[in-house]
């Protein structure tokens, strides 16, 4: 599943552009949006993650071993699910649907089902009402994903990922928490018009300076 497909899937679930970007920004931080990603796997092509997923799917790694992070387990998937009950939900849903636990669609489906659970209703409410990317991203970090590191640097980086994704898929520039855009993009015609306006202002300023210096006596 490409990032665009994840975007469209979440949008089809009713999430706004802002909420979708916040979710995907956190996925980017957690797993680089790779659904088979196993925590700590930096091998080429995520080879270790692929092998681990195959063992889970085949039953060589049992359900209990998967959900309790052993052997060689840990955070897994798009959101790096780690807590046993949440991994159990993902595993059981994949089994129910007859697909791999590393399947992108099943993971996004599980994510949305989790957000509708009573425990995460406060998170869902923010995602459904806020138009602030930083606010949506922060609530996902602090109340949904709950990584060990929730420092300002982490929060800022995840919000940055979210704004980049928003700009890529929503077709417009995302806003910072203070309401100011990251950058302002203008067309060549707009740029030339601004230059002409600036020249006029400078010209008028020169005229005023000359008039001030003119001796009317």
Regions flagged by a language model, labelled:
Residues 5, 31-128:
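Peptidoglycan-targeting cell-wall enzymes and recognition modules
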Residues 20-24, 75-78, 108, 137:
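Extracellular structured ligand-interaction cores
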